[in-house]
Amino acid sequence: MMRFMFLVASLLLCAAAFGAEPVVQLNSATVAPREIEDNTEKAVVRDYTRAWQSLAIALSENNSAALANDFVGQAQDELQQRVSAQQKSGLHTRYIDHGHNVQAVFYSQDGSAMQLRDTARLEVQMLDGDKVIHSDQFTQNYLVVMTAGDARWKVRVLQALPAK
């Protein structure tokens, strides 16, 4: 029985680290020059959530193909380079996502692009095989540009901002 309880607890911890959706809260009250439609706001939250899940999978499994559906342009290029560097070093990164407070800053007149500011609470673990060699919990601010395309929003820019 104890062995079974340990297995269940281990599975729950893994699900929390890898499978759980990050919580993304979007505030669009001050966006300019136009308001965000309700359906668009829901789509942005859904797709930004998926992007963070894809990022976590790509860096955990050292698999840049996981980025293809959610990232384009600069963000995709930079993350692919990071995956490549990890592959060369033999390390991988585990993201444990504790949520995102996202502020919509700009929504283009034609509805094709949106700028966001994200305050993300993250735990990042560097692993060599199964061994954690470094772990850090922090809050990171990001400048994000998302563009519409193929019936979904994709992250074009994901730039970490320096601490104030």
Pin down the residues of each PLM region.
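Short solvent-exposed loop/turn micro-motifs enriched in small/polar/acidic residues
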Residues: 50, 98, 137-139
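Residue-level detector of secondary-structure transition/capping positions
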Residues: 52, 75, 122-124
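Short, low-complexity N-terminal intrinsically disordered segments enriched in polar/charged residues
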Residues: 19-73
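Positively charged n-region of N-terminal signal peptides that target proteins for export
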Residues: 1-5
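Exposed beta-sheet edge and beta->alpha loop/turn motif
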Residues: 111-164
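Short solvent-exposed beta->alpha transition segments
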Residues: 35-39, 64-109
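N-terminal signal peptide c-region/cleavage motif recognized by signal peptidases
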Residues: 14-15
